[in-house]
A protein has these predicted regions:
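Glutamate identity and glutamate-enriched acidic tracts
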Residues: 5, 21-25, 47, 59, ...
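Intrinsic disorder/low-complexity signal
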Residues: 4, 24-25, 52, 67, ...
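Compositionally biased P/S/T/G-rich terminal and signal peptide-adjacent segments
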Residues: 2-43
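Surface-exposed short loop/turn segments
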Residues: 75-101
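Residue-identity detector for threonine
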Residues: 2, 12-14, 20, 50, ...
C-alpha cells in the first residue's frame, strides 16, 4: 500500500479519531487536546493481506487509545517488516495517543 492509501484507509478503520501531526499540534497549542502517550508502538498480528494487516493495526490503535484514556491518535510512522523467508510481513505502527475535547 502507498502512503496515501494507508493515510486514507486507516482512519476509516479506527473508532478513535485520527489527527494529522499538524492538527494535533494546533489542538495542543489551543488547549483543545493533550498528549497522553507519545511514541507508542504496536505490531499487528501477521495476516494474509495488507488490508487485513491494516484492519488489525487499527484495532490495536483503538485498544491503546482506550487503555490510555484517550479518544484521538496521531499516526507517526508505519512499516511492513519482513519476518520470514517466504516474504511474510508484519505491520509496525508508531503513534501518539491523545485526549481531546
Amino acid at each position: 500500500m502507498t502512503p496515501i492509501e494507508v493515510n486514507n484507509k486507516l482512519p476509516t478503520l479506527t473508532k478513535s479519531k485520527y489527527l494529522t501531526q499538524l492538527q494535533a499540534e494546533d489542538n495542543v497549542k489551543n488547549n483543545k487536546c493533550k498528549y497522553l502517550v507519545k511514541n507508542r508502538n504496536y505490531v499487528a498480528p501477521m495476516e494474509l493481506s495488507t488490508k487485513d494487516d491494516l484492519k488489525y493495526g487499527a484495532k490495536g490503535i483503538d485498544e491503546w487509545v482506550k487503555l490510555d484514556g484517550g479518544n484521538d491518535y496521531v499516526l507517526k510512522n508505519y512499516k511492513w517488516v519482513t519476518v520470514d523467508y517466504n516474504g511474510g510481513t508484519q505491520l509496525h505502527i508508531d503513534f501518539d495517543t491523545m485526549l481531546c475535547e
